[in-house]
Each structure stands twice: as structure tokens, then as C-alpha cells.
Amino acid sequence: MKGQRQTMKPIKNFIAAVGLTLALSAITNNAHAQGSNMQEKVKNYFLQTLKTKQNEEQKSKDAFQRNKTYTTDIQQLIKNKDIAQNQKMVWAAWYEANRELNEQKLAKPEDLRKGVKSAWNLPEALEKNAVMPYYYGVKGSAVGKLPLFLYLHGSGPKEHEWATGLILGNRFQDGPSLYFIPQIPNEGDYYRWWQVAKQFAWEKLIRQALVEGNVDANRLYVFGISEGGYGSQRLASFYADYWAAAGPMAGGEPLKNAPVENCANIGFSFLTGADDTGFYRNILTYYTQIAFDSAQLARPLDANKHPLFVHRINLLPGMQHHIKYDLTTPWLKNFVRNPYPKTVLWEDYDMDGRHRSGFYNLQVLSSPTKNRTYYDMNIHNNVVTINIKEVEYTAVERDKHWGIEMRFNRSYTDAKGGRLRIYLNSELIDMNKPVTVIVNGKERYRKNVKANLQDMINSCTEYFDPYRVYPTSIEINY
């Protein structure tokens, strides 16, 4: 009997071990199944939201200009240790939803020297008969994630300007890199890179390029020449939270069209001929230089003690409208975006009647005004301080020939009646400690935040950016 008991003990231990292994396996398989089911649920939400947005864009210009925000009903708290895993799941669901969406896809990049042509049809409701041909190609080694340059051409005959863009893109010393070189869809009054149909194209480009996975999301650059200089200056300010750097050339916008504060945290190059007097390009470039220099003096460092306004703005001596174009992209390529600045300056303005709904980690749920709102956010030691102002412009200089408003004064008053969502992550705050939010000098929030799936989904929908799948947020009425 004693020998039998000794024999039975290892057998019982073996059976217990097998049982434990099977139980753990069942738990693991169940967790995996639950994860797969949740990813499918999130993907279906993303796909339905993308289809809804697509229908809105096709329906009317007014609907596109409203630029509504979307909020999911999917809710689930997440432990801090599981944040990265869930962010990965959400981005995978976003990838799958974009892949399944029925739309014209971004062409696969080939060698830029081949000049392979592709095209997108832009929504008829935004611009009639708008077909945007483009080159999308790679320079140098295609290994790993590459920087992406968006080049905007000038306002000559569009076929000629587009062909010149391909020549320049191949010539510039910035490889290895990817280039997206579009042709303006229509000439005349639609020969503007900042109009709503083109906004549709830029947001589609960024969304699809970041999903494809061969683009470095922190190394996106926009630049252009002449009309493309005007366009890239506007896009630099409007979409600054996506760019690592921007480089208009031979342009010059009145700064009401491209507020310099938005270009905090990015590199900004602006080169114009000193004798380029057409439409006051040299004067307006000089005014931009003064504005950047003044902004740098007023706010030299961000909350992390890094330079806030890194810029190179030069009037090139002895040059008119044609300048040295090769100087810009090598300078731009030195910059890498910080997707999580603790100092955010944002003048929320309309471009062709359309406002952005978010910028960096801010999302506007309800604007305090139909006009302009200025947000000044600083994060330090888990305290989020935001000053929100309404902005009024008064022209103080106009040209006598065309009536172009050249210079402005701005006045600010405290904004009231808005609702703002502030997305946060461990790069911006300590997720284990209470967070305080102060708006216009008044404390609006003081408590701990919790990571959750809803904020990850909402922020992914808003920004379509792999670096901005935020695990938590705070909503503030003011």
C-alpha cells in the first residue's frame, strides 16, 4: 500500500499540473478571443464612421465645412500597464477599417525618376470637375519608414508646373524620402492650394499615408514655390500639428491667413527674393520675419525648455521671383515632429470657411465663437493651464492698388461658452497622480484620470495619427 501511495502522488501532481495548464490555456484563449472580438467591434465602428464622413463630404460643401466631431459609445477602462497593448489594437482596427473602405487609394510609391502618374477625383460638392493628378514616388533606399515631402507648384500652366515639380523633386538633395507632387485640379479661381477640395486631398493623403506604414509620421514636410509658397505658408499654420517643418518659397501671405503662433513646435523656413515686389511678396515675407522674431522673443522656450519658434526667414539679395530652390528641403529634413508638445499655441481660424476640429491634443467640442479663438496651453507638473481668447483683427495697413490688407493689430478677450476636450498621455502627465486644469485663471478640474478605450477610439478618429491614440481625456466647459 505504501508503494501504491507513493506511485499515486506523482500521478496526482501530474493531473493537477495538466489541469492548471489547460485552465491557463483556456483563460489565454478566452482573453485572445475577447481581444479579437473587441478589435472587430472597434474596426466596425471606424468603418461606419469613415463611411459617414465620406457621405458627408460627397453631400455638400456646408457639411464638409462643419467638420463635425465623432464620439463612440464603446467604453472600457484600461489598466495603465495595458495602455500600449490597447493602442496597438486600436491602430490595427483603424488600419483594417481604412483598408476595407471603398475609396480611391494612395498609389504604391515607385521610383520617383519614373514619373508614374496617378489621380484622385475630389468631391464634386467641394469643387466641380476636380481631378487631382499626382506623382507619388520614392527617392533612394525604400527600406524602413521614410520622410514624406508634399510639394506644391506655382500658378503657371498647370501641366508645365507639374512637370517642373517632378524635375525639382528628383533634383533636391533630401533622399531617401517619399514625394507627393500633386497637380492643381482646376485653374482660374480654383488655383489655390488651401481651398476645401484641396483640404480634402491633404487630409486623405495624411490619413492613407500614415495607415500604409511606410511613412514616418513624425517626418512630414510641406513646401512650395510661388502659388505653392502661398499655399504651403497657409497649410503650415493650419495643419502645423502634422508637420515636422514647412518651407514656403517666393510667396508672402498676409499673416491673417497664416498665424505664426500655430507654427510653434515646428521648423519654419521662408525664402523670397529681396527684389520680388509682385503682390508685395518681399514686404509680406519681411512682415512674417518680424512676426516670427517677435514670437521668439516673447516665448523663447516651451514648457520643456526647448526653443519654441525655430525659423529661418531670409530675403535673398539680388533675387526677384526666381530664387535658389535647392536650399529648402535639406534644411527641413533636419526636423522631427514632437507629437506631444507641452506648450501648444493655436489660433483656430477658418480656411475657406472651414475650421479644424482639433490641434495637437486639443479637440473643440463646442466653439465659443464663429470667428477666431486663440488657445494657449502649458503643461507643467500635472497642471494644465489654458488661456482661451476670442480674437479680433483690425487692418492697420492696406495697399492702395488692390486693397490687400497687409498688416493687422489683434485684440483678445476671454472666451466664454465653449467646450474643450484635452487629450492626455504619459508623455504629457503622470497618469498616476491627480491632474489640475486651469482655464482663464479658474480651476475647472482636479482629480485623477483613468485610461479608457473610448478616448483611444475618439482620438484616433479625430487625428488619424499613430502617435495620437490618446488613452485619456478631460472635458472642460468654460
Region roles according to the model:
Residues 265-273:
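Catalytic His-Asp charge-relay segment
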